[in-house]
Amino acid sequence: MFSWMGRQAGGRERAGGADAVQTVTGGLRSLYLRKVLPLEEAYRFHEFHSPALEDADFENKPMILLVGQYSTGKTTFIRYLLEQDFPGMRIGPEPTTDSFIAVMYGETEGSTPGNALVVDPKKPFRKLSRFGNAFLNRFMCSQLPNQVLKSISVIDSPGILSGEKQRISRGYDFCQVLQWFAERVDRIILLFDAHKLDISDEFSEAIKAFRGQDDKIRVVLNKADQVDTQQLMRVYGALMWSLGKVINTPEVLRVYIGSFWAQPLQNTDNRRLFEAEAQDLFRDIQSLPQKAAVRKLNDLIKRARLAKVHAYIISYLKKEMPSVFGKENKKRELISRLPEIYIQLQREYQISAGDFPEVKAMQEQLENYDFTKFHSLKPKLIEAVDNMLSNKISPLMNLISQEETSTPTQLVQGGAFDGTTEGPFNQGYGEGAKEGADEEEWVVAKDKPVYDELFYTLSPINGKISGVNAKKEMVTSKLPNSVLGKIWKLADCDCDGMLDEEEFALAKHLIKIKLDGYELPSSLPPHLVPPSHRKSLPKAD
């Protein structure tokens, strides 16, 4: 479907002009190079916000960034997904991972140090060289032949400690590095330890570095088997309260609760919850290859909007600067007035406040620049980006839909993702409507004597009870009529508007399934069909 799935990006263009492209990846790259990049270069966007995008940024596989305090289980989580050790992996209760490790697919197992990694044009890490040797000495790529890594890559980050000394001693701007990765990954997973929940100051700053990437963030409350149900409720509440103070978004973040390692659960009270949460998280990760093109398109749109706003800010500062005297005083005045300038530009160009960069960070950066060397506003560059946003995005969305339709669904496979897809350990196997699927005896038979007693109190005529009498008993379940109507439709196998004793027992069994919290089947599974109705049941078309 996309270039990183084996199909060549770019390719031949269709007839219809330079804007017609053959692949989504080629279209995104072309739009960026022709429409957005000239605007970025004219107003020093790369110095203020983010380095220029390269081919590898458009062609790389979906990436997941793991962030958390030390010993929350980040490296163990990767080991759990891959079901395999990887080069550079260190696990322990003390702070172990002191480097950023990009875990990627490779035909042979090995590792590449950061300085060599940032000169490889095939890897999307070349722009990390701007963080210097202090960072590059703490960055490596771990490659291994693993089925999971054929579809995704994972970035393991150093465990975050509390304290100012640890932050300073890194030798590089940790939050800036996280922000760089956040702009390029498909999913950001924040890991918390349910047994020792804490959000340090540096972790808070790290989370704030993800501003504008809220849609990518997922939260994992790990090691939840180490606390009982009552404690887990308190921990979950405390986590949501703490996150609410750090992440400024009205939407509630999705939190996955579980124990993500291949060891026995210490507390099995919530086993069913943990399994359901793990499957939800797996489905979210498995969907990343399908959504990668949409994510890249969304990131390009966000980048283009920010580049436009940046151009308005820089050109305004240039326009306000005097030509001869008082330049430094005017510069200080403009920097202090930046919040007012933001409001003025919002009104003048009808731009949302959410498109503007953070005021404080922008003020700090502007201190280092000579405003007289900024460029005045170039309307043609702005018009090119506006034209892209208005007219060029829609065809790409259509192309994404076409590629998804023409190409089989690609899901992440291998590792932990294969452990619950087949056999009795598949989620929901032998539960709810699936109970008794591999048994010879009719599963309803074990409770049928109880149901028969009820049946004969409902005045059966010729071995059947009417819909009116059946309703009197079924409504005692307090289920809504819409659900009871579906149960009636499933239980009335011969569609005669009445229930015999087996059909009534089936209806009571389906009610029990629903009351236990399981979903009803859309059609009656063969193993639930009453024995006396199995030959007469009409075959599905």
Curated annotation (Swiss-Prot):
<keyword id="KW-0967">Endosome</keyword>
<dbReference type="GO" id="GO:0005886">
    <property type="term" value="C:plasma membrane"/>
</dbReference>
<dbReference type="GO" id="GO:0051260">
    <property type="term" value="P:protein homooligomerization"/>
</dbReference>
<dbReference type="GO" id="GO:0030139">
    <property type="term" value="C:endocytic vesicle"/>
</dbReference>
<feature type="binding site">
    <location>
        <position position="223"/>
    </location>
    <ligand>
        <name>ATP</name>
    </ligand>
</feature>
<comment type="similarity">
    <text>Belongs to the TRAFAC class dynamin-like GTPase superfamily. Dynamin/Fzo/YdjA family. EHD subfamily.</text>
</comment>
<feature type="region of interest" description="G4 motif">
    <location>
        <begin position="222"/>
        <end position="225"/>
    </location>
</feature>
<feature type="binding site">
    <location>
        <begin position="68"/>
        <end position="75"/>
    </location>
    <ligand>
        <name>ATP</name>
    </ligand>
</feature>
<dbReference type="Pfam" id="PF12763">
    <property type="entry name" value="EH"/>
</dbReference>
<dbReference type="InterPro" id="IPR031692">
    <property type="entry name" value="EHD_N"/>
</dbReference>
<dbReference type="GO" id="GO:0016020">
    <property type="term" value="C:membrane"/>
</dbReference>
<feature type="domain" description="EH">
    <location>
        <begin position="447"/>
        <end position="535"/>
    </location>
</feature>
<feature type="binding site">
    <location>
        <position position="494"/>
    </location>
    <ligand>
        <name>Ca(2+)</name>
    </ligand>
</feature>
<dbReference type="GO" id="GO:0070062">
    <property type="term" value="C:extracellular exosome"/>
</dbReference>
<feature type="region of interest" description="G1 motif">
    <location>
        <begin position="68"/>
        <end position="75"/>
    </location>
</feature>
<feature type="binding site">
    <location>
        <position position="492"/>
    </location>
    <ligand>
        <name>Ca(2+)</name>
    </ligand>
</feature>
<keyword id="KW-0472">Membrane</keyword>
<feature type="binding site">
    <location>
        <position position="261"/>
    </location>
    <ligand>
        <name>ATP</name>
    </ligand>
</feature>
<keyword id="KW-0106">Calcium</keyword>
<dbReference type="GO" id="GO:0005524">
    <property type="term" value="F:ATP binding"/>
</dbReference>
<keyword id="KW-0479">Metal-binding</keyword>
<dbReference type="InterPro" id="IPR027417">
    <property type="entry name" value="P-loop_NTPase"/>
</dbReference>
<feature type="binding site">
    <location>
        <position position="498"/>
    </location>
    <ligand>
        <name>Ca(2+)</name>
    </ligand>
</feature>
<dbReference type="Pfam" id="PF16880">
    <property type="entry name" value="EHD_N"/>
</dbReference>
<dbReference type="InterPro" id="IPR040990">
    <property type="entry name" value="DUF5600"/>
</dbReference>
<keyword id="KW-0067">ATP-binding</keyword>
<dbReference type="GO" id="GO:0030100">
    <property type="term" value="P:regulation of endocytosis"/>
</dbReference>
<dbReference type="InterPro" id="IPR000261">
    <property type="entry name" value="EH_dom"/>
</dbReference>
<keyword id="KW-0007">Acetylation</keyword>
<dbReference type="GO" id="GO:0005509">
    <property type="term" value="F:calcium ion binding"/>
</dbReference>
<dbReference type="Pfam" id="PF00350">
    <property type="entry name" value="Dynamin_N"/>
</dbReference>
<dbReference type="GO" id="GO:0072659">
    <property type="term" value="P:protein localization to plasma membrane"/>
</dbReference>
<dbReference type="GO" id="GO:0002042">
    <property type="term" value="P:cell migration involved in sprouting angiogenesis"/>
</dbReference>
<keyword id="KW-1003">Cell membrane</keyword>
<feature type="binding site">
    <location>
        <position position="496"/>
    </location>
    <ligand>
        <name>Ca(2+)</name>
    </ligand>
</feature>
<keyword id="KW-0965">Cell junction</keyword>
<dbReference type="GO" id="GO:0003676">
    <property type="term" value="F:nucleic acid binding"/>
</dbReference>
<dbReference type="GO" id="GO:0005525">
    <property type="term" value="F:GTP binding"/>
</dbReference>
<dbReference type="InterPro" id="IPR002048">
    <property type="entry name" value="EF_hand_dom"/>
</dbReference>
<feature type="domain" description="EF-hand">
    <location>
        <begin position="479"/>
        <end position="514"/>
    </location>
</feature>
<comment type="function">
    <text>ATP- and membrane-binding protein that probably controls membrane reorganization/tubulation upon ATP hydrolysis. Plays a role in early endosomal transport. During sprouting angiogenesis, in complex with PACSIN2 and MICALL1, forms recycling endosome-like tubular structure at asymmetric adherens junctions to control CDH5 trafficking.</text>
</comment>
<dbReference type="GO" id="GO:0071363">
    <property type="term" value="P:cellular response to growth factor stimulus"/>
</dbReference>
